[in-house]
Amino acid sequence: MRKKYLLLFLFVLFASSAFSQISKTHYIPPITSNGSTAAYIGEQWIYISTPSVDQVVFTITDINNGSIITGEVKNDEPYSLLLSSDESSSGLVTPISEVGNTTNSNGYVINADCPIYVSVRFFATTSLYQAGAFTSKGSSGLGTHFRTAMMPMGNKTTTNLASDFTSYVSVMATQDNTIVRATLPNATASANIIGIPGFTPGTPLEFNLNEHENIILAVNPEAGSGNRRFALFGALIESVDASGNQDPTKPVAVTVGSGNGTFSESTGGRDSAVDQIVPIQNIGHEYIFIRTEGDDSRENVILVADVDGTEIYISNDTTPTETLNAGEFIIIEGDKYDGSSSGASMYVRTQGDSYPVFAYQGVGGPATPNQGMFFVPPLSEDAQDDIDNIAQIHKIGSETLSGRVSIVYKDGATIEVNTGEKVGGTYSYTPVDLSGITTNTVIGKPGYKTYQISGLEGDIQVKSDDELYVAYFNISGAASSGGFYAGFATPPAAAISLDLESLGACVEFDPVSGDYVFNGDGFKMNNPD
């Protein structure tokens, strides 16, 4: 029976399904590896979870060979899939010999009947020397304007290079005839962009991609070539039309990362770091970072400016630490946190919302090789998603790690953390006792607090009745991985006119058409904005 509705609603109505990284469609661009012994990628896994108590049907399409895997997932039955045991036979990993001017058809596309979370996790070799993970940002990750960063191999003045260090940017098209333009403001003539001979500084690179095709830009700065390590920092990745204007009808997905890398300028530990990032419309000018368990040299924050004259303020400072132009970046060392222990916080802002920055966080465990990188969401009143759930926080395949979550929340909000597991054939959630966990009040941003909770296993729920930002992190020996599961949000229109049939309860925004789609068929509501 057809009905017409005019809905005036708050964001929370569809927050968990329409406006965050939980999504019905996920694009997974490939990563790359230089094949070195320490960083050689072994097992690669996809983890899928959902808040739905009913079965959700999904498909995983391997772009490389066209194979399709169909599966089901529900809240008490998260799903995991071994993609490959070796990087040489993987649809996730593009060999370093095929990056640059070569257009590839690697990576994965995941479609589901209802919104799902997707994370990719991997480790390098069976000895767990290195590990990496990234969370798909779903529809929030699609756009036409991105700025990049990765592991810096030191700070701006001191290099800590290894001969097998690699950094990369991976871009996947969602539509045919997509023009990807990459502008590299920090690349010099000797930058050695792999697979692109004769690179000319200041001249953008352009690539023509069809649906699901991808391009990877990579650098391998060897010891003594320190200027190359920043070649891909601040890169402007755009989807443009034939006239060179950004083309909103052809959004792309972007992943950035490093292999055998480090944030430290002094220690010898190395690890992998990778994350999928979001476009300009989903970043902001205020951020809160939560320290993990590394030393100051590894607990870094990298901010990339998109607008000239961007002023960076730390904590409650009234004088900017640095002023950046578009494509420039700052590396903030760990001594700027309000403490040296895990759970300490750092508030960073610019002078206003007209000066957004792309934010990356270096994270670490107690051992010097334990390193990773998160792409961090901005503070936003629209970030009100519960996390339900992070699948098997302590696992990468058969390997067991120690799980943690970092939480930013509003003072006075109710926070609930639960661990889920099946015991004796019955699945249940058990509350985590938060009474003994120290909360941290954020200096410079009254009204916000942080938690860090360690020793977690199983499937993790995090719930709040206000803003919520959640990252997970796991470590084992020399390896670590993690990423944000909550915080990336797109504000909805205030009023939407619905002309619908009763087809279900799964609503999602389509960034290509600008419509809200119900169950993927038979229904859409036009977004007047």
State where each predicted segment sits.
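Intrinsically disordered, low-complexity linker/terminal regions across diverse proteins
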Residues: Q21-G520, N527
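Bacterial Sec-dependent N-terminal signal peptides
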Residues: M1-S23
